[in-house]
């Protein structure tokens, strides 16, 4: 006869303490691939801009070969597709403004949309929702209202097609070859909270999960792709890929919307065990011994639209500023 462990919510250490601050983000936080391609042309076309938000996340933990479990789910609320497209527009406008400030020639939409390659593009319906394989997050991705949402192989796992599908890649190559330009597609994705868990243990008794609210740039999902080609069938490309989580700030309030556990039942049993009444008063009716310990909770991160817009603009400015530094460092001879 022994005490039981209960599933519990454990407040994690401040998420910002384990992230890079937005004003401290640098190229050291990015993986750079084939930046020399940026020097192939002074002309740049930006046919799409991808903006995403994590809409749902969850974490689970267990201990004692499954006898104790904890589960937490969280949703982002107060955001719709129209708001996301407006945020995508603001981020895209910042990118184009900074790109023009580098002195590069930024092609207009009429020229881009009239190109042969553009006509061959297969856009992804927006908003695009994706729960990547072996990932608890569900991400919504959009483009500005007036731009197509384009997906290519390097966008995996936020993709609606196989990495071996070369249709859009060849269309972008055709666009680059026809317009004699670089083609760039940035992607900016933010999450709303950091979730932690004690994992799934065979011998450990307890199971803990926790949540820390706060927007941050998502590694891997946040990046910038570029392409250059002389013919449609073959080209070259490069990328800047965020490798670290970058804290952006708060844009709303975290609210617990549900909780379900048998912690009180477990504590009653543990108090009975610790009291030794089972030995000193063997004829006393004992409380029922729980066979499992569980703790389930749900949360909502309720967005303030104004705060979210400010946070997205701040994240876009910081991210795009680094991109422009790489573009300026790789100019045509």
Question: For each of these PLM feature ranges, what is it?
Answer:
Residues 1-15:
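N-terminal export signals
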Residues 15-333:
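A structural "domain/chain start" motif
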């Amino acid at each position: 006869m022994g005490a039981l462990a209960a599933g519990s919510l454990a407040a994690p250490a401040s998420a910002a303490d384990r992230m890079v601050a937005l004003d401290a983000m640098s190229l050291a936080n990015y993986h750079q691939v084939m930046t020399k391609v940026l020097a192939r042309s002074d002309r740049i076309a930006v046919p799409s801009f991808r903006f995403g938000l994590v809409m749902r996340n969850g974490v689970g933990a267990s201990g004692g070969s499954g006898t104790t479990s904890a589960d937490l789910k969280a949703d982002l609320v107060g955001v719709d597709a129209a708001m996301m497209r407006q945020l995508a527009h603001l981020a895209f406008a910042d990118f184009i403004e900074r790109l023009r400030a580098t002195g590069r020639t930024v092609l207009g939409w009429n020229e881009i949309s009239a190109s042969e390659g553009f006509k061959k593009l297969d856009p992804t319906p927006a908003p695009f929702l994706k729960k990547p394989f072996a990932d608890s997050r569900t991400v919504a991705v959009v483009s500005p209202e007036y731009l197509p949402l384009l997906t290519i192989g390097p966008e995996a796992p936020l993709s609606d097609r196989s990495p071996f599908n070369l249709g859009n890649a060849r269309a972008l190559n055709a666009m680059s070859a026809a317009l004699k330009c670089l083609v760039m597609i940035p992607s900016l994705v933010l999450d709303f909270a950091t979730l932690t868990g004690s994992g799934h243990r065979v011998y450990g008794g307890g199971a803990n999960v926790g949540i820390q609210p706060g927007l941050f740039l998502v590694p891997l999902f946040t990046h910038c792709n570029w392409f250059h080609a002389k013919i449609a069938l073959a080209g070259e490309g490069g990328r800047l890929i965020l490798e670290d989580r970058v804290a952006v700030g708060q844009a709303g309030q975290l609210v617990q919307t549900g909780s379900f556990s048998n912690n009180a039942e477990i504590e009653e049993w543990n108090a009975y065990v610790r009291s030794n009444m089972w030995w000193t008063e063997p004829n006393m009716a004992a409380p029922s011994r729980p066979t499992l310990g569980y703790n389930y909770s749900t949360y909502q991160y309720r967005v303030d639209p104004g705060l979210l817009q400010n946070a997205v603009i701040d994240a876009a400015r910081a991210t795009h500023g680094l991109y422009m530094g790489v573009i300026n460092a790789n100019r045509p001879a």
